[in-house]
From Swiss-Prot:
GO MF annotation terms: hyalurononglucosaminidase activity
Gene name, Swiss-Prot/TrEMBL: HYAL4
Tissue specificity as recorded in UniProt: Detected in placenta and skeletal muscle.
Keyword set, alphabetical order: Disulfide bond, EGF-like domain, Glycoprotein, Glycosidase, Hydrolase, Membrane, Transmembrane, Transmembrane helix
Source organism of this protein record: Homo sapiens (Human)
One Gene Ontology CC term in the entry: membrane
Database matches in SUPFAM superfamilies: (Trans)glycosidases
Protein name in UniProt: Hyaluronidase-4
Functional summary from the UniProt entry: Endo-hyaluronidase that degrades hyaluronan to smaller oligosaccharide fragments. Also has chondroitin sulfate hydrolase activity, The best substrate being the galactosaminidic linkage in the sequence of a trisulfated tetrasaccharide.
Amino acid sequence: MKVLSEGQLKLCVVQPVHLTSWLLIFFILKSISCLKPARLPIYQRKPFIAAWNAPTDQCLIKYNLRLNLKMFPVIGSPLAKARGQNVTIFYVNRLGYYPWYTSQGVPINGGLPQNISLQVHLEKADQDINYYIPAEDFSGLAVIDWEYWRPQWARNWNSKDVYRQKSRKLISDMGKNVSATDIEYLAKVTFEESAKAFMKETIKLGIKSRPKGLWGYYLYPDCHNYNVYAPNYSGSCPEDEVLRNNELSWLWNSSAALYPSIGVWKSLGDSENILRFSKFRVHESMRISTMTSHDYALPVFVYTRLGYRDEPLFFLSKQDLVSTIGESAALGAAGIVIWGDMNLTASKANCTKVKQFVSSDLGSYIANVTRAAEVCSLHLCRNNGRCIRKMWNAPSYLHLNPASYHIEASEDGEFTVKGKASDTDLAVMADTFSCHCYQGYEGADCREIKTADGCSGVSPSPGSLMTLCLLLLASYRSIQL
Protein backbone atom coordinates (compact mmCIF):
# COMPACT_ATOMS: atom_id res chain seq x y z
CA MET A 1 0.00 0.00 0.00
CA LYS A 2 1.29 3.45 -0.87
CA VAL A 3 1.32 5.67 2.24
CA LEU A 4 1.43 9.45 2.19
CA SER A 5 4.34 11.11 3.91
CA GLU A 6 3.84 13.25 7.02
CA GLY A 7 4.29 16.39 4.97
CA GLN A 8 1.73 15.28 2.41
CA LEU A 9 -0.78 14.48 5.12
CA LYS A 10 -0.37 17.98 6.54
CA LEU A 11 -1.43 19.33 3.17
CA CYS A 12 -4.66 17.38 3.47
CA VAL A 13 -5.62 17.55 7.13
CA VAL A 14 -4.70 20.66 9.01
CA GLN A 15 -6.58 19.90 12.23
CA PRO A 16 -6.12 17.12 14.82
CA VAL A 17 -7.65 13.82 13.75
CA HIS A 18 -9.07 11.31 16.23
CA LEU A 19 -8.18 7.61 16.19
CA THR A 20 -11.48 6.73 14.52
CA SER A 21 -10.65 9.19 11.76
CA TRP A 22 -7.27 7.55 11.23
CA LEU A 23 -8.93 4.17 10.91
CA LEU A 24 -11.32 5.53 8.29
CA ILE A 25 -8.43 7.21 6.48
CA PHE A 26 -6.55 3.90 6.46
CA PHE A 27 -9.44 2.10 4.83
CA ILE A 28 -9.91 4.89 2.28
CA LEU A 29 -6.23 4.75 1.34
CA LYS A 30 -6.32 0.98 1.17
CA SER A 31 -9.37 0.96 -1.08
CA ILE A 32 -7.79 3.51 -3.42
CA SER A 33 -4.43 1.75 -3.59
CA CYS A 34 -6.14 -1.63 -4.11
CA LEU A 35 -8.58 -1.00 -6.94
CA LYS A 36 -10.43 -4.06 -8.16
CA PRO A 37 -8.74 -5.99 -10.95
CA ALA A 38 -10.19 -6.04 -14.44
CA ARG A 39 -12.14 -9.03 -15.66
CA LEU A 40 -10.19 -11.10 -18.19
CA PRO A 41 -10.93 -10.03 -21.80
CA ILE A 42 -13.49 -12.09 -23.67
CA TYR A 43 -11.41 -12.49 -26.82
CA GLN A 44 -7.84 -13.83 -26.91
CA ARG A 45 -6.64 -11.60 -24.08
CA LYS A 46 -7.15 -8.52 -26.26
CA PRO A 47 -7.23 -5.47 -23.93
CA PHE A 48 -9.49 -3.42 -26.21
CA ILE A 49 -11.77 -4.76 -28.93
CA ALA A 50 -14.22 -3.36 -31.44
CA ALA A 51 -17.60 -5.08 -31.81
CA TRP A 52 -20.00 -4.65 -34.73
CA ASN A 53 -23.74 -4.46 -34.07
CA ALA A 54 -25.28 -3.33 -37.36
CA PRO A 55 -27.44 -5.18 -39.94
CA THR A 56 -24.91 -4.85 -42.76
CA ASP A 57 -25.36 -8.50 -43.70
CA GLN A 58 -28.30 -7.06 -45.65
CA CYS A 59 -25.84 -5.35 -47.98
CA LEU A 60 -24.69 -8.77 -49.17
CA ILE A 61 -28.20 -10.20 -49.33
CA LYS A 62 -29.81 -7.29 -51.17
CA TYR A 63 -26.97 -5.83 -53.24
CA ASN A 64 -24.25 -8.50 -53.27
CA LEU A 65 -21.98 -6.01 -51.51
CA ARG A 66 -19.68 -7.60 -48.94
CA LEU A 67 -18.08 -5.63 -46.09
CA ASN A 68 -14.76 -6.78 -44.67
CA LEU A 69 -15.36 -6.90 -40.91
CA LYS A 70 -12.30 -8.92 -39.90
CA MET A 71 -11.20 -6.15 -37.53
CA PHE A 72 -14.31 -6.89 -35.43
CA PRO A 73 -13.86 -10.11 -33.43
CA VAL A 74 -17.41 -9.78 -32.12
CA ILE A 75 -20.19 -9.33 -34.69
CA GLY A 76 -23.97 -9.35 -34.50
CA SER A 77 -26.99 -7.95 -36.31
CA PRO A 78 -29.78 -6.25 -34.34
CA LEU A 79 -32.44 -7.69 -36.68
CA ALA A 80 -35.16 -9.73 -34.98
CA LYS A 81 -34.51 -12.85 -37.05
CA ALA A 82 -30.83 -12.96 -36.10
CA ARG A 83 -29.98 -15.79 -33.70
CA GLY A 84 -26.87 -17.34 -32.20
CA GLN A 85 -24.68 -14.24 -32.48
CA ASN A 86 -21.88 -13.16 -30.16
CA VAL A 87 -23.52 -9.73 -29.86
CA THR A 88 -27.18 -10.21 -28.97
CA ILE A 89 -29.37 -7.20 -28.31
CA PHE A 90 -32.77 -7.66 -26.70
CA TYR A 91 -35.29 -4.98 -27.64
CA VAL A 92 -38.66 -4.63 -25.89
CA ASN A 93 -40.34 -7.23 -28.11
CA ARG A 94 -37.65 -9.89 -27.76
CA LEU A 95 -37.36 -10.58 -24.05
CA GLY A 96 -40.42 -11.50 -22.05
CA TYR A 97 -43.34 -9.10 -21.64
CA TYR A 98 -41.83 -5.66 -21.16
CA PRO A 99 -44.53 -3.15 -20.06
CA TRP A 100 -44.60 0.21 -21.81
CA TYR A 101 -46.83 2.89 -23.33
CA THR A 102 -46.93 3.92 -26.96
CA SER A 103 -46.65 7.60 -27.88
CA GLN A 104 -50.47 7.59 -28.13
CA GLY A 105 -50.74 6.38 -24.52
CA VAL A 106 -51.72 2.81 -25.40
CA PRO A 107 -50.48 0.33 -22.78
CA ILE A 108 -48.45 -2.66 -23.97
CA ASN A 109 -48.18 -5.58 -21.54
CA GLY A 110 -50.01 -3.54 -18.91
CA GLY A 111 -48.04 -0.35 -19.49
CA LEU A 112 -46.53 -0.28 -15.99
CA PRO A 113 -44.22 -2.79 -14.28
CA GLN A 114 -46.81 -2.85 -11.45
CA ASN A 115 -49.37 -4.26 -13.89
CA ILE A 116 -47.50 -7.27 -15.25
CA SER A 117 -46.94 -10.65 -13.62
CA LEU A 118 -43.20 -10.94 -13.08
CA GLN A 119 -43.41 -14.74 -13.14
CA VAL A 120 -45.23 -14.79 -16.48
CA HIS A 121 -42.69 -12.34 -17.88
CA LEU A 122 -39.74 -14.45 -16.72
CA GLU A 123 -41.21 -17.63 -18.20
CA LYS A 124 -41.49 -15.92 -21.59
CA ALA A 125 -38.03 -14.35 -21.19
CA ASP A 126 -36.53 -17.79 -20.58
CA GLN A 127 -38.00 -19.00 -23.87
CA ASP A 128 -36.67 -15.92 -25.67
CA ILE A 129 -33.16 -16.38 -24.29
CA ASN A 130 -33.12 -19.99 -25.48
CA TYR A 131 -34.30 -18.86 -28.91
CA TYR A 132 -31.92 -15.95 -29.47
CA ILE A 133 -28.93 -17.50 -27.65
CA PRO A 134 -29.23 -21.26 -28.26
CA ALA A 135 -25.65 -22.04 -27.19
CA GLU A 136 -25.45 -22.67 -23.44
CA ASP A 137 -21.73 -21.80 -23.45
CA PHE A 138 -22.40 -18.37 -24.99
CA SER A 139 -19.65 -15.96 -23.90
CA GLY A 140 -20.46 -12.85 -25.91
CA LEU A 141 -22.27 -9.58 -25.26
CA ALA A 142 -25.90 -9.82 -24.12
CA VAL A 143 -27.42 -6.34 -24.17
CA ILE A 144 -30.92 -5.56 -22.90
CA ASP A 145 -32.21 -2.40 -24.57
CA TRP A 146 -35.19 -1.15 -22.56
CA GLU A 147 -35.54 2.62 -22.82
CA TYR A 148 -39.22 3.49 -22.36
CA TRP A 149 -38.97 4.00 -18.60
CA ARG A 150 -36.22 4.26 -16.04
CA PRO A 151 -36.32 2.41 -12.69
CA GLN A 152 -35.91 5.63 -10.71
CA TRP A 153 -39.00 7.81 -10.31
CA ALA A 154 -37.07 11.08 -10.51
CA ARG A 155 -35.57 10.18 -13.89
CA ASN A 156 -38.87 9.64 -15.69
CA TRP A 157 -39.16 13.15 -17.06
CA ASN A 158 -40.48 14.56 -20.36
CA SER A 159 -42.12 11.79 -22.44
CA LYS A 160 -41.43 9.28 -19.67
CA ASP A 161 -43.62 11.24 -17.25
CA VAL A 162 -46.53 9.10 -18.42
CA TYR A 163 -45.23 6.34 -16.13
CA ARG A 164 -45.50 8.66 -13.14
CA GLN A 165 -48.95 9.85 -14.20
CA LYS A 166 -50.27 6.33 -14.68
CA SER A 167 -48.72 5.19 -11.40
CA ARG A 168 -50.50 8.00 -9.55
CA LYS A 169 -53.79 7.07 -11.21
CA LEU A 170 -53.29 3.45 -10.23
CA ILE A 171 -53.08 4.47 -6.57
CA SER A 172 -55.89 7.05 -6.68
CA ASP A 173 -58.24 4.49 -8.26
CA MET A 174 -57.75 2.21 -5.25
CA GLY A 175 -59.44 4.55 -2.79
CA LYS A 176 -61.22 7.89 -2.68
CA ASN A 177 -59.82 9.11 0.62
CA VAL A 178 -56.12 9.00 -0.23
CA SER A 179 -54.38 12.37 0.05
CA ALA A 180 -52.29 13.79 -2.77
CA THR A 181 -49.17 13.38 -0.62
CA ASP A 182 -49.92 9.71 0.01
CA ILE A 183 -50.72 9.14 -3.65
CA GLU A 184 -47.36 10.57 -4.67
CA TYR A 185 -45.49 8.52 -2.08
CA LEU A 186 -47.28 5.23 -2.81
CA ALA A 187 -47.06 5.71 -6.57
CA LYS A 188 -43.32 6.29 -6.34
CA VAL A 189 -42.69 3.34 -4.02
CA THR A 190 -44.79 0.84 -5.96
CA PHE A 191 -43.33 1.90 -9.30
CA GLU A 192 -39.71 1.78 -8.14
CA GLU A 193 -40.10 -1.54 -6.35
CA SER A 194 -41.77 -3.13 -9.38
CA ALA A 195 -39.28 -1.63 -11.84
CA LYS A 196 -36.35 -2.80 -9.73
CA ALA A 197 -37.71 -6.33 -9.46
CA PHE A 198 -38.46 -6.42 -13.19
CA MET A 199 -34.96 -5.38 -14.26
CA LYS A 200 -33.08 -7.25 -11.54
CA GLU A 201 -34.87 -10.57 -11.98
CA THR A 202 -34.63 -10.39 -15.78
CA ILE A 203 -30.87 -9.98 -15.85
CA LYS A 204 -30.54 -12.55 -13.06
CA LEU A 205 -32.37 -15.01 -15.31
CA GLY A 206 -30.08 -14.17 -18.22
CA ILE A 207 -26.95 -14.80 -16.17
CA LYS A 208 -28.38 -18.03 -14.77
CA SER A 209 -29.28 -19.27 -18.27
CA ARG A 210 -26.07 -18.15 -20.00
CA PRO A 211 -23.56 -17.61 -17.16
CA LYS A 212 -20.59 -16.88 -19.40
CA GLY A 213 -22.39 -14.08 -21.21
CA LEU A 214 -21.69 -10.43 -20.44
CA TRP A 215 -25.21 -9.33 -19.51
CA GLY A 216 -26.01 -5.68 -19.05
CA TYR A 217 -28.47 -2.90 -19.88
CA TYR A 218 -27.88 -0.52 -22.76
CA LEU A 219 -27.40 3.11 -21.69
CA TYR A 220 -26.55 2.13 -18.12
CA PRO A 221 -24.95 3.99 -16.54
CA ASP A 222 -26.04 7.30 -18.01
CA CYS A 223 -24.33 10.58 -17.17
CA HIS A 224 -27.19 12.83 -18.37
CA ASN A 225 -24.73 15.46 -19.58
CA TYR A 226 -26.84 16.20 -22.66
CA ASN A 227 -26.77 20.00 -22.36
CA VAL A 228 -24.05 20.07 -25.02
CA TYR A 229 -25.14 23.45 -26.43
CA ALA A 230 -24.96 25.26 -23.11
CA PRO A 231 -22.43 28.09 -22.77
CA ASN A 232 -19.28 26.96 -20.96
CA TYR A 233 -20.33 23.30 -21.26
CA SER A 234 -17.88 21.23 -19.22
CA GLY A 235 -19.23 17.77 -20.00
CA SER A 236 -19.32 16.80 -16.34
CA CYS A 237 -22.15 14.66 -15.03
CA PRO A 238 -24.60 16.69 -12.91
CA GLU A 239 -24.13 16.00 -9.22
CA ASP A 240 -27.71 14.79 -8.81
CA GLU A 241 -27.19 12.25 -11.59
CA VAL A 242 -24.00 10.92 -10.03
CA LEU A 243 -25.88 10.40 -6.77
CA ARG A 244 -28.71 8.67 -8.62
CA ASN A 245 -26.19 6.37 -10.27
CA ASN A 246 -24.89 5.52 -6.81
CA GLU A 247 -28.42 4.58 -5.78
CA LEU A 248 -28.52 1.98 -8.56
CA SER A 249 -26.04 -0.28 -6.77
CA TRP A 250 -28.56 -3.13 -7.03
CA LEU A 251 -28.38 -2.87 -10.82
CA TRP A 252 -24.59 -2.74 -11.00
CA ASN A 253 -24.35 -5.69 -8.60
CA SER A 254 -26.73 -7.64 -10.85
CA SER A 255 -24.88 -6.86 -14.09
CA ALA A 256 -21.96 -8.63 -15.75
CA ALA A 257 -21.01 -5.66 -17.96
CA LEU A 258 -21.82 -1.99 -18.51
CA TYR A 259 -23.01 -0.57 -21.83
CA PRO A 260 -22.95 3.25 -21.84
CA SER A 261 -23.54 5.16 -25.07
CA ILE A 262 -21.70 8.10 -26.62
CA GLY A 263 -23.67 8.94 -29.75
CA VAL A 264 -22.72 12.49 -30.79
CA TRP A 265 -24.11 15.29 -32.97
CA LYS A 266 -22.90 16.58 -36.33
CA SER A 267 -23.79 20.11 -35.30
CA LEU A 268 -20.99 19.80 -32.72
CA GLY A 269 -18.61 18.11 -35.13
CA ASP A 270 -14.89 18.32 -34.26
CA SER A 271 -15.68 20.49 -31.25
CA GLU A 272 -14.34 20.24 -27.73
CA ASN A 273 -17.88 19.58 -26.55
CA ILE A 274 -17.95 16.19 -28.27
CA LEU A 275 -14.74 15.30 -26.46
CA ARG A 276 -16.14 16.51 -23.12
CA PHE A 277 -19.43 14.69 -23.67
CA SER A 278 -17.70 11.38 -24.38
CA LYS A 279 -14.95 11.71 -21.79
CA PHE A 280 -17.24 12.21 -18.81
CA ARG A 281 -19.70 9.52 -19.88
CA VAL A 282 -16.99 6.89 -20.17
CA HIS A 283 -15.30 8.09 -16.99
CA GLU A 284 -18.56 7.79 -15.06
CA SER A 285 -18.96 4.23 -16.34
CA MET A 286 -15.43 3.36 -15.25
CA ARG A 287 -16.25 4.75 -11.80
CA ILE A 288 -19.39 2.65 -11.56
CA SER A 289 -17.53 -0.46 -12.76
CA THR A 290 -15.60 -0.65 -9.48
CA MET A 291 -18.56 0.04 -7.17
CA THR A 292 -20.11 -3.42 -7.19
CA SER A 293 -20.06 -6.46 -4.95
CA HIS A 294 -18.04 -8.32 -7.59
CA ASP A 295 -14.37 -8.95 -6.84
CA TYR A 296 -13.45 -7.45 -10.21
CA ALA A 297 -14.29 -4.27 -12.11
CA LEU A 298 -17.15 -4.77 -14.55
CA PRO A 299 -16.02 -4.63 -18.19
CA VAL A 300 -17.25 -1.49 -19.95
CA PHE A 301 -18.27 -1.71 -23.61
CA VAL A 302 -19.10 1.71 -25.01
CA TYR A 303 -21.80 1.95 -27.66
CA THR A 304 -21.10 4.39 -30.46
CA ARG A 305 -22.29 4.93 -34.03
CA LEU A 306 -20.88 5.18 -37.52
CA GLY A 307 -22.64 8.48 -38.00
CA TYR A 308 -24.03 11.37 -36.00
CA ARG A 309 -27.33 11.43 -34.11
CA ASP A 310 -28.67 14.31 -36.18
CA GLU A 311 -27.20 13.07 -39.50
CA PRO A 312 -26.92 9.25 -39.35
CA LEU A 313 -25.45 8.88 -42.84
CA PHE A 314 -22.79 11.52 -42.26
CA PHE A 315 -20.01 9.47 -40.69
CA LEU A 316 -17.69 10.51 -37.88
CA SER A 317 -14.69 12.67 -38.72
CA LYS A 318 -11.18 11.54 -37.81
CA GLN A 319 -11.19 13.90 -34.84
CA ASP A 320 -14.52 12.60 -33.60
CA LEU A 321 -13.26 9.02 -33.89
CA VAL A 322 -10.51 10.04 -31.48
CA SER A 323 -13.00 11.81 -29.20
CA THR A 324 -15.20 8.70 -28.96
CA ILE A 325 -13.29 5.48 -29.67
CA GLY A 326 -9.92 6.89 -28.63
CA GLU A 327 -11.29 8.26 -25.36
CA SER A 328 -12.91 4.93 -24.54
CA ALA A 329 -9.66 3.03 -25.00
CA ALA A 330 -7.53 5.52 -23.07
CA LEU A 331 -9.92 5.56 -20.11
CA GLY A 332 -9.77 1.78 -19.73
CA ALA A 333 -12.90 0.46 -21.46
CA ALA A 334 -12.84 -3.18 -22.57
CA GLY A 335 -14.12 -2.22 -26.00
CA ILE A 336 -16.51 -0.29 -28.18
CA VAL A 337 -19.67 -1.51 -29.91
CA ILE A 338 -20.54 0.15 -33.21
CA TRP A 339 -24.30 0.17 -33.64
CA GLY A 340 -26.35 0.87 -36.73
CA ASP A 341 -29.93 0.44 -37.95
CA MET A 342 -31.62 -0.40 -41.24
CA ASN A 343 -30.97 3.09 -42.62
CA LEU A 344 -27.41 1.95 -43.30
CA THR A 345 -28.69 -0.70 -45.70
CA ALA A 346 -31.73 1.10 -47.16
CA SER A 347 -30.03 1.44 -50.55
CA LYS A 348 -27.00 0.23 -52.43
CA ALA A 349 -25.59 3.75 -52.18
CA ASN A 350 -25.84 3.61 -48.39
CA CYS A 351 -24.17 0.21 -48.25
CA THR A 352 -21.40 1.48 -50.52
CA LYS A 353 -20.88 4.46 -48.25
CA VAL A 354 -20.64 2.22 -45.18
CA LYS A 355 -18.16 -0.06 -46.94
CA GLN A 356 -15.97 2.88 -47.94
CA PHE A 357 -15.92 4.26 -44.39
CA VAL A 358 -15.13 0.88 -42.82
CA SER A 359 -12.33 0.27 -45.32
CA SER A 360 -10.79 3.72 -44.80
CA ASP A 361 -10.97 6.06 -41.80
CA LEU A 362 -12.88 3.80 -39.40
CA GLY A 363 -10.93 0.64 -40.14
CA SER A 364 -7.59 2.38 -40.06
CA TYR A 365 -8.30 4.03 -36.72
CA ILE A 366 -9.60 0.84 -35.11
CA ALA A 367 -6.49 -1.01 -36.30
CA ASN A 368 -4.37 1.78 -34.80
CA VAL A 369 -6.04 1.89 -31.38
CA THR A 370 -6.47 -1.85 -30.89
CA ARG A 371 -2.83 -2.54 -31.79
CA ALA A 372 -1.59 0.32 -29.60
CA ALA A 373 -3.60 -1.12 -26.70
CA GLU A 374 -1.98 -4.51 -27.32
CA VAL A 375 1.52 -3.01 -27.48
CA CYS A 376 0.98 -1.11 -24.26
CA SER A 377 -0.48 -4.16 -22.52
CA LEU A 378 2.41 -6.36 -23.63
CA HIS A 379 5.24 -4.01 -22.72
CA LEU A 380 3.85 -2.25 -19.64
CA CYS A 381 1.59 -4.95 -18.21
CA ARG A 382 3.18 -8.18 -19.51
CA ASN A 383 -0.09 -8.94 -21.28
CA ASN A 384 -1.73 -9.37 -17.87
CA GLY A 385 -3.60 -6.06 -17.80
CA ARG A 386 -4.80 -3.14 -19.90
CA CYS A 387 -3.34 0.34 -20.01
CA ILE A 388 -5.31 3.29 -18.65
CA ARG A 389 -4.39 6.93 -18.34
CA LYS A 390 -2.50 7.91 -15.23
CA MET A 391 -4.41 11.19 -15.28
CA TRP A 392 -7.88 10.43 -16.59
CA ASN A 393 -8.43 13.92 -17.97
CA ALA A 394 -5.09 14.16 -19.80
CA PRO A 395 -4.95 14.41 -23.63
CA SER A 396 -3.01 11.16 -23.98
CA TYR A 397 -4.16 8.35 -26.26
CA LEU A 398 -3.29 4.79 -27.17
CA HIS A 399 -2.04 5.65 -30.64
CA LEU A 400 0.76 4.11 -32.66
CA ASN A 401 3.66 6.41 -33.47
CA PRO A 402 3.56 6.89 -37.27
CA ALA A 403 7.37 7.06 -37.23
CA SER A 404 7.46 3.49 -35.89
CA TYR A 405 4.40 1.89 -37.47
CA HIS A 406 2.71 1.76 -40.82
CA ILE A 407 -0.89 0.67 -41.42
CA GLU A 408 -1.53 -0.88 -44.82
CA ALA A 409 -4.99 -1.35 -46.30
CA SER A 410 -5.66 -4.03 -48.90
CA GLU A 411 -8.09 -3.64 -51.76
CA ASP A 412 -10.69 -5.74 -49.97
CA GLY A 413 -10.57 -3.54 -46.86
CA GLU A 414 -8.29 -5.57 -44.61
CA PHE A 415 -5.71 -3.73 -42.49
CA THR A 416 -2.19 -4.85 -41.65
CA VAL A 417 -0.06 -3.11 -39.04
CA LYS A 418 3.69 -3.22 -39.63
CA GLY A 419 6.44 -1.91 -37.40
CA LYS A 420 7.80 -2.06 -33.88
CA ALA A 421 7.63 0.27 -30.90
CA SER A 422 10.84 2.16 -30.22
CA ASP A 423 12.30 2.63 -26.76
CA THR A 424 11.04 6.21 -26.90
CA ASP A 425 7.53 5.02 -27.77
CA LEU A 426 7.50 2.70 -24.77
CA ALA A 427 8.88 5.42 -22.50
CA VAL A 428 6.08 7.77 -23.55
CA MET A 429 3.50 5.05 -22.83
CA ALA A 430 5.04 4.42 -19.41
CA ASP A 431 4.92 8.14 -18.60
CA THR A 432 1.26 8.57 -19.50
CA PHE A 433 -0.35 5.17 -18.82
CA SER A 434 -0.45 2.69 -15.97
CA CYS A 435 -1.68 -0.90 -15.77
CA HIS A 436 -5.07 -2.11 -14.66
CA CYS A 437 -4.23 -5.74 -13.96
CA TYR A 438 -6.51 -8.60 -14.88
CA GLN A 439 -7.88 -10.96 -12.25
CA GLY A 440 -5.12 -13.07 -10.76
CA TYR A 441 -2.31 -10.54 -11.29
CA GLU A 442 -0.91 -7.59 -9.41
CA GLY A 443 2.03 -5.20 -9.25
CA ALA A 444 2.92 -2.12 -11.28
CA ASP A 445 3.53 -4.28 -14.35
CA CYS A 446 1.06 -7.07 -13.44
CA ARG A 447 3.83 -9.65 -13.32
CA GLU A 448 3.00 -10.93 -9.84
CA ILE A 449 0.47 -13.66 -9.17
CA LYS A 450 -2.17 -12.20 -6.89
CA THR A 451 -2.20 -13.60 -3.38
CA ALA A 452 -5.43 -14.51 -1.64
CA ASP A 453 -5.39 -11.47 0.63
CA GLY A 454 -3.38 -9.14 -1.56
CA CYS A 455 -4.34 -6.18 -3.70
CA SER A 456 -4.36 -5.82 -7.42
CA GLY A 457 -5.33 -3.20 -9.92
CA VAL A 458 -3.94 0.31 -10.39
CA SER A 459 -1.49 1.92 -8.03
CA PRO A 460 -2.20 5.61 -7.42
CA SER A 461 0.06 7.96 -9.33
CA PRO A 462 1.47 11.19 -7.88
CA GLY A 463 -1.28 13.02 -9.73
CA SER A 464 -3.82 11.27 -7.53
CA LEU A 465 -2.63 13.14 -4.43
CA MET A 466 -5.26 15.86 -4.74
CA THR A 467 -8.02 13.26 -4.93
CA LEU A 468 -6.60 11.54 -1.85
CA CYS A 469 -6.48 14.83 0.00
CA LEU A 470 -10.08 15.67 -0.80
CA LEU A 471 -11.24 12.24 0.32
CA LEU A 472 -9.25 12.50 3.54
CA LEU A 473 -10.60 15.95 4.29
CA ALA A 474 -14.16 14.90 3.50
CA SER A 475 -13.89 11.90 5.79
CA TYR A 476 -12.51 14.04 8.60
CA ARG A 477 -15.29 16.59 8.27
CA SER A 478 -17.97 13.91 8.20
CA ILE A 479 -16.63 12.43 11.43
CA GLN A 480 -16.53 15.83 13.10
CA LEU A 481 -20.17 16.34 12.20
